Amino acid sequence: SKTLPFLISEKGMTAGVELAGPGAVAEDLRLQYRYLDLRRPSMQDHFIKRHRIVKRVRDFLDERGFLEIETPVLTKSTPEGARDYLVPSRVHPGHFYALPQSPQLFKQLLMISGFERYFQIVRCFRDEDLRPNRQPEFTQIDLEASFIDEEFIYELMEELTVRMFAVGGIELPRPFPRMTYREAMDTAGSDRPDLRFGLRFVEATDIFRNTNYAIFQKIIQAGGCVKGINVKGQSDVLSKNVLQNEYAKQIVPSLGGKGM
């Protein structure tokens, strides 16, 4: 074997030792030297855990009688919630394939064909603007089953989620809390409330029914309601001045709120 044209000091041998966390290096630089970035133990651990989670998903759904069936990637455009990514066809000039936003139609075909339980670890593509909960391509656990009720889905997804988190050494408390859509909207104003946030909306319409405050009057007369958040023991922090200036003019608009 040939010798290296330079000497490697023992001090430079850092196998298995992470010299700096991801925050210590600019993301652009990490991506430029991705092959070095992926040598870090923490990065490799992400890939290893993902592999084990996906394997756990496959094993669990196989135990429950689900078949993993791949669906086409180059397909016809179908109505979905975003724009399609289009791929020009070489064989048919002027025509395009569409990358799937989801395998919705294909899995419905499988159901009516007699495959009663299907799943797929599938790549999806959506041409939409980047947001915290949106990206152009993503992988999802896609499944479908025939002749079941909602209780079947509740129990299936709870058990699957518990097993997935267990791969990372996280034990989730059971049973999972359940909340109706109406309860979520009434108490949190969202159909996906963050349960870590303990403050819930409190109905205050009756308190303000005879108020002279024009905005509240207009809302109540139109059949709307007035709700608030009861923040106890924070009067010295959330003063009227802070609420009217810092929160109403800066924080609320930055989060998409119209006013406060």
Question: What is the meaning of each model-derived region?
Answer:
Residues 1-260:
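Class II aminoacyl-tRNA synthetase catalytic cores and aaRS-like
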